[in-house]
């Protein structure tokens, strides 16, 4: 689904040198926008795409392409090959919602690479607007997974669903996970 951007809007990739603008956009919308966390996203090979109106960033999302997706809620590191893309953390500023801007932005995003791609995304089941937008983009739900964390080192979690690239970390075949100190340190280093 590709929708045109409105007049005065421009689709662009936000590079590491644009991090201060991203921090400002996050904070202007009530999010922490921690520079060190955004830096880790770039360090882990993630790419950020946005829509700009004038000098203002009004929407953005992150894409992982050929780099692993770490789902810290499950302690799963999911490898992605060169034909797989994980889209995450899409955001549209409140005053621009309801204008199908997310669809236009994602439509522009899928044209960035010429290689045929398989797209993945994760959405909270309580985020109905995002679920509707994902459905409009052609995504379909293939699994619902759950996790519960106890303290800093123990998880109860679903097993990875079939159809998802098989997670490589941390012991994805175990529903009950208790991490060692080294695993906890590794886990924290992956969160971005």
Predicted features along the sequence, with ranges:
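Conserved N-terminal entry element of GNAT/NAT acetyltransferase domains
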Residues: 1-21
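Short, positively charged
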Residues: 19-35
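Conserved acyl-donor/pantetheine-binding loop and adjacent beta-alpha core of acyl/acetyltransferases
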Residues: 37-48, 52-89, 156
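Anionic, Ser/Thr-rich low-complexity intrinsically disordered regions
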Residues: 62, 120, 150-152
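Conserved acetyl-CoA-binding loop-helix of GNAT-fold acetyltransferases
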Residues: 86-112, 132-136
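Conserved GNAT acetyl-CoA-binding A-motif
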Residues: 113-125, 145
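Conserved active-site alpha-helix within GNAT-family acetyltransferase domains
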Residues: 125-145
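C-terminal "cap" of GNAT-fold acetyltransferases
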Residues: 148-192
């Amino acid at each position: 689904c590709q929708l045109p951007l409105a007049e005065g809007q421009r689709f662009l990739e936000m590079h590491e040198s644009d991090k201060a603008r991203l921090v400002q956009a996050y904070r202007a919308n009530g999010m922490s926008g921690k520079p060190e966390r955004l830096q880790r996203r770039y360090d882990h090979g993630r790419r950020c795409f946005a829509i700009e109106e004038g000098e203002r960033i009004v929407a953005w999302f992150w894409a992982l392409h050929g780099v692993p997706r770490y789902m810290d809620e499950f302690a799963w590191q999911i490898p992605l090959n060169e034909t797989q893309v994980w889209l995450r953390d899409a955001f549209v500023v409140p005053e621009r919602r309801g204008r199908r801007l997310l669809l236009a932005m994602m439509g522009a995003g899928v044209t960035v690479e010429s290689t045929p791609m398989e797209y993945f995304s994760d959405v909270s089941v309580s985020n109905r607007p995002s679920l509707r937008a994902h459905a409009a983009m052609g995504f379909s739900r293939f699994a619902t997974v759950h996790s519960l964390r106890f303290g800093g080192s123990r998880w109860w979690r679903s097993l990875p669903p079939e159809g998802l690239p098989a997670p490589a970390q941390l012991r994805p075949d175990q529903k009950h996970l208790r991490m060692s100190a080294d695993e906890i340190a590794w886990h924290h280093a992956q969160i971005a």
